[in-house]
Amino acid sequence: VQSGVGRTGKFLATEHYDIQPDMVTLAKGLGGGVPIGALLMTEEVALKMPKGGHGTTFGGNPLACAAALAVLEEIEGRNLLQHVSEVGNYFQEQLRSIASPKIRTVRGKGLLI
């Protein structure tokens, strides 16, 4: 939830590392301002969940789902992940160029600086 979809230059921040999470939660950025949440899980975990074990009275809201679909289409259609990587690198370079004793290091991935 904190890193948001695409904020690091990859759809999920976990893609930068050699890990495969069993579950990942998404929210905020997925809806582009419209409240939504999602839980992604491996097939192995999903098959162990009891039927109805992941239900919600608000699940499947058509407006929220349409907003999330629009966000996903924009990310893909505008090649935003590549853009985030490029702009993030630029920002980090610029921040490093104004180094001062108060800025010890600049680190991050994409726009999660």
Positions of predicted regions on the chain:
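Conserved N-terminal phosphate-binding loop of PLP-dependent enzymes in the Aspartate aminotransferase
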Residues: 1-113
